[in-house]
């Protein structure tokens, strides 16, 4: 979630009024249900790869014939190889990945990778979105008893090359996370989380963990348990700082973030019931256009 005037003002307000005697026991983090549903539907079988390849080629051929194909877009059937590479990529991570309990004598830092290319990086964090450079910076500044654990995005298998993964494994204090482990498990096990714009930064606040943030416009950057950095030296200083944060500050961050999200947002209690309902698009369009028209009347005509 990016910054907004409402969220910034709200976080500053709740940080100021936080009482150390205030309870945060009722503040719970619930995993976004759509993520669980979508990730459970991922099918990386050979049959599915062939099926998607045929569909993709036919669909792109149809766009070319109809003249819908964009200039300077992806090359024809350019995504097809990724459908097959993801099968090998998952086997690679299961072979070389480690479990949460594999490093009992070491501390860990978790960095969940983003899906790339993706708008959450290219548009929301245009200043810095180089995951490999982040990994190099963090790994060079960690204490000798700490391992940087990299967790792949479920939708990115097949997009990053085997050579990319090989380069990660050549870094002495970097390990890959097994596919059967969750981000939540690694956050709870780690001393802090590395994030650019992903949800792992927010999850860490709810799980009372510090965050090393590389996303300039992250709203969590305003919290006392988060350090925003943009270069190697800031990374070094922030890591030292994050490892010395007082435990009471974590409650303050959780309280301020949760209260701000609740005050600036709104609930959609039945949104999962209509998640895949295309027939709602027209109705939502009418509602939104009606609201926009009403606001126009009030703002521009009502002031006359």
Regions found by a protein language model. Name each.
Residues 1:
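Conserved nucleotide-sugar donor-interacting segment of glycosyltransferase catalytic cores
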Residues 103, 169, 187-188:
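A short, aliphatic-rich alpha-helical micro-motif
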Residues 5-64, 93-96, 105, 226-304:
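C-terminal amphipathic helix plus adjacent low-complexity
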Residues 103-132, 137, 146, 152-155, ...:
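Active-site donor-nucleotide binding/catalytic segment of nucleotide-sugar enzymes
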Residues 179-226:
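A donor-sugar binding/catalytic signature common to diverse glycosyltransferases
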Residues 59-101, 124-127:
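Segments forming glycine/polar-rich beta-alpha architectures that bind adenosine-containing cofactors
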């Amino acid at each position: 979630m990016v910054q907004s005037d409402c969220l910034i003002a709200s976080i500053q307000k709740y940080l100021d009024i936080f009482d150390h005697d205030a309870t945060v026991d009722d503040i719970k983090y619930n995993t976004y249900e759509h993520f669980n549903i979508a990730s459970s539907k991922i099918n990386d079988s050979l049959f599915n790869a062939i099926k998607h390849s045929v569909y993709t080629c036919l669909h792109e051929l149809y766009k070319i014939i109809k003249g819908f194909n964009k200039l300077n877009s992806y090359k024809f059937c350019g995504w097809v190889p990724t459908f097959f590479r993801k099968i090998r990529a998952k086997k690679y991570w299961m072979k070389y990945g480690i479990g949460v309990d594999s490093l009992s004598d070491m501390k860990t830092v978790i960095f969940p990778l983003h899906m790339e290319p993706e708008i959450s990086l290219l548009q929301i964090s245009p200043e810095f979105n180089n995951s490999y450079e982040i990994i190099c910076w963090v790994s060079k500044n960690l204490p000798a008893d700490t391992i940087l654990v990299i967790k792949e995005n479920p939708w990115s298998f097949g997009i990053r090359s085997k050579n990319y993964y090989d380069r990660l494994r050549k870094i002495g204090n970097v390990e890959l996370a097994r596919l059967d482990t969750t981000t939540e498990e690694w956050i709870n096990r780690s001393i802090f989380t590395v994030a650019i714009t992903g949800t792992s930064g927010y999850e860490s606040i709810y799980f009372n963990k510090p965050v090393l943030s590389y996303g300039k416009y992250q709203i969590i950057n305003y919290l006392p348990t988060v350090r925003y950095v943009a270069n190697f030296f800031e990374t070094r200083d922030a890591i030292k700082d994050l490892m010395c944060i007082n435990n009471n500050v974590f409650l303050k961050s959780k309280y301020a973030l949760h209260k701000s999200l609740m005050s600036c947002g709104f609930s959609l209690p039945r949104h999962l019931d209509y998640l895949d309902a295309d027939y709602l698009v027209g109705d939502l369009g009418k509602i939104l256009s009606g609201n926009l028209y009403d606001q126009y009347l009030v703002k521009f005509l009502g002031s006359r």
